[in-house]
Amino acid sequence: MNEPGSTFGAGEAPEERLRALLQHVGHFLPAQGPIGVFVHHNTLHAFQHLPFHDALAAASALFEAEPYLSEAEFRAHIASGRIDDQDIEAALAERFAETPDERRGPLSRIEIERLALRFPIETATQAGLGWRIAETGATRELRPDLPSGPYHRLLVYTERWLAERPHAAARLLDQGGRDPESRAALALWDACRGVPLPPTEPAEPPLVDRVGVDRSHRDLLLAITGEDPAELIDPPFIRLLGAYLDEGVAHWAMPDRAQGLFRAFRGLVLEGSRPAGAHFAGLDAELRAIGANMPPAAVAVAALRDLGVAEQRWEGYVTRVLLELPGWAGMVHRFEHTPSDRPAGAPPASLLEYLAVRLTLARYALRDVARRRLGYRGPLAGLVEHARRAARPVEPPPRSPDGDRPFRLFQLAQLAGLSVAQIQPLSAADRVWALEVLEGLDEMARRRLLHEAYEHHHRVEVLHGIAANLRRPEDERAVRSPRFQVALCIDDRCEGLRRHFEELSPRHETLGIAGFFGVPIRYRGLDDAGHASLCPVNVAPAHEIVERPREEGAALVRKARRRRWARFVHALGHGTRTLSRGVLLTPTLGLFSTIPLVGRTLFPRAYARLRRAFERRLLPAVPTQLHSPHEEGTAQGRGGAAFTASEKAARVAATLEIMGLTRRFAPLVVMLGHGSISVNNPHQSAYDCGACGGRHGGPNARLFAAMANDREVRAQLRERGIDIPDGTFFLGGMNNTTTEEIVLYDDHLAPASHRGEIAALKDALGEARKRHAHERCRRFASAPARLSPEQALAHVEARAVDLSEARPELGHATNAVCVIGRRELTRGLFLDRRVFLVSYDPTQDPSGAILERVLLSAGPVGAGINLEYYFSRVDNLRYGAGTKLPHNLASLLGVMDGALSDLRTGLPKQMIEIHEPVRMLTVVETSTETAAAICARQPALRELIHNGWIQLACLDPATGQIARFTRGAFAPFTPPERPLPEVARSLDWYAGKSGFVPPAIIRATPSRPSLEIADHAA
């Protein structure tokens, strides 16, 4: 935000300045679109121009949100070994890299900070400390968490000191010091409080001075009276927004929506629909006086002036008002600037009109609370000054000069192993210096350093694993003569499926690429009502593809049945909501609905199978094919042009070149898209393919395979140096990441010579998906402890159709790494389904041009997913959506808690519970010079990398050396000397473990049947 004294467009009218201000302030609002097309993004996109930790501090102040895990969580990680001493030392080394250490007396700055990170050093009020001393003997015993070294030093040195001072020993005996520990504690406490110390001073300005800076009148009244004025206006305001923005829930549309939010609101009030409550008395008269033609901007400006907010403070005040309901305000802002998110005929969206309505209602609520709770009946412009006079000063909790700071010194001395003999001689200046160092490392600074240590531990584990894997013979990691090649999305959930598929045979090869496979399209499936863009959200598809039946006769019968069934279901649903038919239908349908309800609740998997069988009977599946409405040429239609042969060849070539698959083709090459299907899950789109705009990637895979099989395309590819053998056939497919179902498309088009291999491929994929389901089940708390792969597969299938299941799958939870390079870097390495695997061959890209394209797509996409999970994990109430349990779908836009709340943006608790919030470690197989040159050319990448939103490491393809980007330069990484564990298969490493599992070498042996796998199940 700008400084409070700043203005926008100083020479313009106030209304125009307010418009310009809203353009700026709108960036602080959530950018999440409608929940049906959920696309992951950096929650703090407005702060991305700042270094990571600075951005977190700024956002924490603005949103009142947590930037890191809590200190208690970090200390639990220290206790479990997730953060060790080496990690803390590494974090401190980074902190003091450019600042020399300082020592005063027996302690240095780095020693004090090390102790503050390892152990909690508490503060206490005077009353609290007195109670602890009297009731718990806090100063008569040493800390229970004191390590043995400092503990024994304190006892030994204190006894020596007392031996030379009999009078001191006698005094301690009178105080209760009858054993070495109590004598050491009492003597140390006397020494710590022996020199008077000045108390710390609070620095935060009074709340009344912050109105218009980072607080509003609502905050002021809430703090003074305990009553929140927003509770009076939120219910009618949320109902108004829900009705105005509704995209299909309401049976009757709100009137006058086409005129804009403010005029529609005014019309409702003047027609007698004024918000309920005596506090809104006079609202209809005010709106009538405003007139129908008064611009909303003028209404908002008048409201701000009525509130007494000076223009130089508009920005801070308006920001605070918009952040009262950030979800709704953010949705309005997104619709205003991204109208393509909305269906045709949707009403106009304007953040300015939102503000005008909000301020209009807010003034009535503020007057009411001020009158009832403060007895103030004057103009709102004088409310702040009245509050200044009326409110008692809020004093900080009393702190004792004789207790609080000496008590912290008492704790610090214990942890450092400093006895009375070393503390007593310290001057007041030395004591204050030590305490100021301790106080300077406040809670936020400690959490920042502990977070760095937390990330360091993970970073070393991953880079050590990759370095150890590279030391294996290349023949163990490379596939010389592939039988099957399967290209999957770079999605971290695909890492496990790829690993299990490769463990089945050394001739199984997998690759990774963005799941739209380089073919952005507008797609309409056979049963779809409209088109959907299957491509990244920043790409506008120029081509339209539709799914059509191969036989029109059967398709027409199916279509007619589907329409009749839809009309019947709609009539029943609508009828239950009407007075006349509802009386008859509701009891009857209610009785019969108990049968499917019991089935879906108690036997979800069996019920789902029965329902699918019924649907197949009612609506038989028909064979289909992909078709462009303009295949005869490039004439533009409603959906864009057809793909020409040269465009097809260019798309296929680009995708194959990015993956490094330009030679050594297998007889069968599969492009496997992915998506997720589950029930009772408003966030289902968040589980789908982000590269396809939050939708399924199967159509893209199917289209790419058809292009790659085209003879004319292959002829043009040969001219480009990509010679696909005649014996190679491409297949498209779809992987349901919830159920592990894998469907291959158009296998009937394969030559007869490939039918046997296709059957073998299906068997291998079937075995891999069972093993992958088994690995996934170890992270589900509700999954039985001992499952065979077949049972595990049945379990994940049941989760997808269970109405009560809040976690059908875990999505991208646990994502932490992106590896861009050849599969040889990670083949045979257990990476715990935490890695985005992007195929790239540096030997085929001497200029780095291909890598630049890969980084521009994978970098921001991976960072967006990673950072959304990060922020939803560290503060699920502010940055996330909270628990799913009270969620209700609102206007087909998002979810609310219960019937009336803000739109909950971010990810729900059930998607992030097991996530480790670490920034993405991006490992790129390239030289540091190439990476630096790309960053210099690409501002978007430079912002992410130089500001630390992602962590970059380069693996030199010539030397195998790893270098990490830190503090603006690359520094060599030296892996630990300890060997990496080695096992025969993934199951042997993860069996019996439900948490995160570090990397290990998988020396795959010939495939064994699933029955034998079951014998080793955890």
Curated annotation (Swiss-Prot):
Superkingdom assignment: Bacteria
Membrane topology per record: Peripheral membrane protein
Cellular component, GO annotation: plasma membrane
Entry keyword Zinc: yes
Residues that hold Zn(2+) according to the record: 489, 491, 674, 689
Keywords tagged on the record: Cell inner membrane, Cell membrane, Membrane, Metal-binding, Transport, Zinc
GO MF assignments: zinc ion binding
One Pfam family from the record: DabA
Cofactor(s) listed: Zn(2+)
Subcellular location: Cell inner membrane
Its job: Part of an energy-coupled inorganic carbon pump.
Similarity comment: Belongs to the inorganic carbon transporter (TC 9.A.2) DabA family.
Subunit organization: Forms a complex with DabB.
Protein name (database record): Probable inorganic carbon transporter subunit DabA 2
Species the sequence originates in: Sorangium cellulosum (strain So ce56)
UniProt lineage: Bacteria, Pseudomonadati, Myxococcota, Polyangia, Polyangiales
